[in-house]
Amino acid sequence: MMLRRNAVRSLKTMEISVSNVVNSGSIAMLRGKLANVVLSDRTYHSSPIFHKNVPKGVLDKKNGREQRKTEQNVFNVDPASPWRHELLSFDECVSSALKYSTTPLQNTYKRIGNNQLNKNPSFAMFWDSMGRAMELYYSLRESPDFNAYRVSRLIHLLHNGLRSTRDQLVKLSRKPDYDSQSFHKEMMNFLCNSLKDISDDILIGKVSVSGYGATHLLTSFKELSFDDDCIRIWEASKNLSDETTSQAFQEPKVVGFMLPLLYAKTRSLTEPNELYNQIIQSKEFIHPNLYSGLIKVFIKAEDYEKALSLFGQLCEKAEVRNYGYLIETHLSFIGDSKNLTLAESFFDKIINDEMPYKIILQVSTVNSFLQNIWKAQNDFDHVYRIWEKAVKFYGNTVNPGILSSLNNTFFTIFFENYINDNINGFRKLQEIITFYSGVKKIDEPFFNVMLTRASIWHERSIIDFIDKNYTLYHIPRTIISYRILLKSLGSIDNTNNEEILDRWLELVKKLNELGQQYIANADLSALRDATVVWSQSKRDEKVFSAKAKGTPATTTTTEDDIKVPKPLENLKNEDSTSNSEDRIELYLKILKRYTPYFRATKQVYRYTTGCAESYPILNEYLSGYSDLSAEDIPVPQLHSFIAKEQ
């Protein structure tokens, strides 16, 4: 099924004048033209068939039959082959694991908690099958029957495992689950090493690969941020004597993937322009990934006329099974376009649900859009307007992590905008909280992000204000907020050791309540930031001030050197001010008192001598660390912690 012809005519009408519009800078005209684009066709959007996973064979019966015939041929094994048993075992391992992973692993992750994940039979079987497949790979790569399709399916499987593992590591980074993190990091190393071994074998001609496998291989390296490796592999493939592999890396879908990477490195439009002219003159529909790659390049190059022209062809010629490429390029117009009016027009089409295809608005795209607005215009009102639209659009339908990422970008810009105007900034902050609470229930990450970014104000009152809002909005606190509240004390002067110690004890009690057995690095880092980092900043300020005045600086900081900022209106507090020596002494005492509850002895080195490498002020106190008495530091009753013998 093609996109409707009458809808495509609207897009073509826009393309004719878009060049003049862009060149003349008539933003209003561009916006008006784009408003009539194919994407406004609501009738087609309501067609239920467009949202179903239509089997490939239904769309292209001839290609489907040919594919099944090809698969039967590549899986045939000569009964007399000495590799027969291993080949059949390999095929079974890969097939079973692929079947499991293409019913996304996310479904399994949702059904069972992270603590039980590694014990789940299906989950374990997936990783066992993958591990067994790699073992067989190292044996079978010498076999003449180990063809390009088998290698490609293995790469596909590794790519699936890579994506699921990366997703889990992102989720676990927000949770104190050391064992699960350790497992997934181990799997990540296994996957990276496996992909590297296969790519090395491909480049020396030991194994072959199809375009299907080449795409998964390069995409895997791209997702690992190994862009240079992608380019190295692709360039080397041109000179391979293995014709199957060499041609595979030159297939349109692979070239389409590589185009944005190559442009990012060379900034050359010679080849993209040549490919563009070939596509325009050709009557055949080339692989949509080539269109997608070219569109991304031309958006980056700010050649929007060509980008929109190709997008129009993709809309006209793409079949239902290609809708993912339409979505991908649509998001590129939002996140990568420097023409903010063009980007906002594509953004609004999603927000207003005017798409002829189902689309998920990726938060990374919105984040890029917000950053582009701020960088180009320095217009916070525009940023705020887009953020409001996005929050309303997401509402309560997305994972909290999605909004946490969006809010992190937004509040980074917010505090940059109000860095020297905390009075008006605080009023705006109250307005933001009121708006947000009217759209969805405020959760802990919202205030966590706000509190983290608010440290730039060095204002005690904002910390107290946000702290009270956790209670006001009945938000259950996780260990994350306890760490942030402790860490935030390192951004202000008007606190004292008693408060820092109280915050530390609250953190430890929360860890005990959660059943944690050890003090984690994240806990010690929060304590370090509240004490050592603050002390180092005071020392640096004093040295800088002395240099500016042309007077020698002393090596210690006194209370007279510390200036307490004026609190926000109507939010006064009377906390006393601690000095650098007091905070560092408290830091070292807490470290010493709680050392038995560290997971590893190397943590002591990391947060003493290791810490002093970044914060030299600590060196002045380490010589007396071994003789320091920490008996006056309390330790609450700990039921879950495991104390180590000293």
Swiss-Prot record:
Q: Transit peptide boundaries, per UniProt?
A: 1-14
Instruction: Enumerate the PPR repeat regions by residue range.
Output: 209-238, 251-282, 288-317, 323-353, 363-394, 401-439, 444-473, 481-514
**Superkingdom, natural source:** Eukaryota
Specify the protein's topology with respect to the membrane: Peripheral membrane protein
Q: Which UniProt keywords apply?
A: Membrane, Mitochondrion, Mitochondrion inner membrane, Phosphoprotein, Repeat, RNA-binding, Sporulation, Transit peptide
One GO biological process from the UniProt record? sporulation resulting in formation of a cellular spore
Recorded hits in InterPro entries, A to Z, give:
TPR-like_helical_dom_sf
The places in or outside the cell where this protein is found are: Mitochondrion inner membrane
PTM section of the record: Phosphorylated. Phosphorylation promotes binding to RNA.
Phenotype upon knockout is: Abnormal meiosis.
Under the GO molecular function aspect, what terms does this record hold?
Answer: mRNA 3'-UTR binding; mRNA binding
- What residues make up the propeptide removed on maturation? 15-51
One Gene Ontology cellular component term attached to this UniProt record is: mitochondrial inner membrane
Q: Any other comment in the entry?
A: Present with 4800 molecules/cell in log phase SD medium.
Oligomeric and partner information: Monomer.
Q: What is known about what this protein does?
A: Binds the RNA motif 5'-AAUAA[U/C]AUUCUU-3' in the 3'-UTR of mitochondrial mRNAs. Involved in the processing or stability of mitochondrial mRNAs.
* Protein family membership: Belongs to the RMD9 family.
Q: How is this protein named in the record?
A: RNA-binding protein RMD9, mitochondrial
Organism this protein belongs to:
Saccharomyces cerevisiae (strain ATCC 204508 / S288c)
Question: Which gene carries the instructions for this protein?
Answer: RMD9
